[in-house]
């Protein structure tokens, strides 16, 4: 990892501490040499050359092959000055009598905000840009989550600004095995033309970026996690099925939904309460209290859900209505932005203010967490502003002017929960679903979804590259609203009762089975499985089939979560990450790897009876449904009846499955597991287990069982178990099956190595 910084100042320059980067610089052995105007710095992996004449920096392999180079004279720092007139008032503070600015604009009628004296703030900054030269045919990924449908991010201009459905991350990764993170949090334009590739940000003190070289896609993501923070373990139950809609209008309805799932015997782990649980009046917006009369007995609701082993997530926004207690408390601290949010009676809080973050958590803790809330749905964390003037973004946050830090705002809303929930207890893992994110959001236990998208096969297809590009930015937990947020329009007028929409929903449901989070949600039309018909009707049966498949995969999903945490791995992987030398994978946007084993090819065309699937050339592939072994490096045509999503398993994969049906993820211990071997190559897998929903694993309370397959000798080795934890299964049965054959053996495992020959 190389940090490159450029300023107009000379001498020792104290650059600001990064808000996204947590990795501290370390001593690295570097050989430095100079020849004329060229300065070369070489490490054991990388060579960096600085042209003192043009300011160009070039990155190369040790063999001299170029990875990336800046453009000659490709840097710009244009001085800018912002002037702001703000109001002041005396407020409660840690320092007696301290004056804290409310920062409402002159003459602005801001409900709930006091008026006071005026003063002027002048900020000197720069518009900063840096241009690079990429190879003409070089393919790059990343830039957060976009809704363009593009996998390759070349040949376009993108304004990176946090918005609903668009997550702004100024980072791209190349198929050449490197990544580049532009460390600037203001609105930034990415521009790629035949003349060059550039980042241009509207405010910054300096050019500041990080070059990461891992040699391949997986290794570069791992470096990005080292740079910006590792993703902690998620609770096991979060990998089960989630049900939601916009919105459950009473606590009785919430409990009724859970009861119906249990009565039907369809697995369910999480239910999500969307907005208005605080009441219907906009002045009570996001009070973070159950003030709605239809939620007057929240303790009863949590008690009922607890008896059914159903967890709850709740919607919390960063804006607060002017009639709420929390609004008034934040207002006293001068911690509300002056701009109008949604609704107009609400204002967004300054998440960069640690005291304000503490206030928000205090309400979440008192009125939600202590009652039994298990997870947090952080909506509109861009945040949303309406009719804001440019001068409004001169607001001085605790990290500088808001315009300078706008894009990193969602990271701090997640930080508010992570820091404070962990300070409250380590017995329950933080789990956050946030609509916007930034480099480093993963370190706070946050994942994202793709926002308020509309229902169509075209939009569905675009979610695949949106999620893959987002995951490449180092944030591993991502999902979508199954069936899209908006189901209505000119196409699906009856939504869940419309066979055409049911087809879209079921195809989307299959895709979601192979996402890090499997979650049904949307507006206008109910989404519960029983709303689509009764058991025996295809739209019900296929959903149930895939929910049960999801639960059978829990050992694989949880073990992959450990690889994400321990080794910086990813659930969602573009095919080039699996086969980096297969150029045919580079542009593919409608297939992906799910973990190490599964190649998934969602059905993204209406009424499709088959679809073509490219199998990378790095190995053989096995049809998940039939066991047929196929050579890589070819396109196959796979039949796609409504119950089938094409899934192929990489040869050599070892996939653990549960053997007992459950109603929730932790209902039964894994004392009997199937190990399914997909032959054709050597393989390995690490089965991971821990206490499921606390942080004891950070102190070593977990176990790993290494498993290897020797394809030539046809020997499976289940290695010695490493580690221990409270409640660990000490003795279990493994049913070992060879995919595509009748070969099967059952063994008893007590933690000592076993070798099974076939």
Segments predicted by a language model, with ranges:
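Aromatic- and carboxylate-enriched substrate-binding clefts and catalytic-loop regions
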Residues: 16-20, 267-543, 578-579
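A low-complexity, Ser/Thr/Gly/Pro-enriched, surface-exposed linker/loop concept
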Residues: 1-39, 77-80
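Catalytic core of carbohydrate-active enzymes
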Residues: 418-430, 437-448, 470-480, 485-715, ...
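Solvent-exposed beta-strand/loop surfaces of large extracellular or lumenal domains
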Residues: 13-32, 335-340, 623-642, 743-758
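Extended Gly/Ser/Thr-rich low-complexity repeat segments
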Residues: 5-23, 49-65, 71-73, 725-742
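Beta-sheet entry/capping signal
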Residues: 1, 40, 47, 56, ...
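Catalytic and substrate-binding clefts that recognize carbohydrates or anionic sugar/phosphate headgroups
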Residues: 5-7, 34-235, 245-246, 251-252, ...
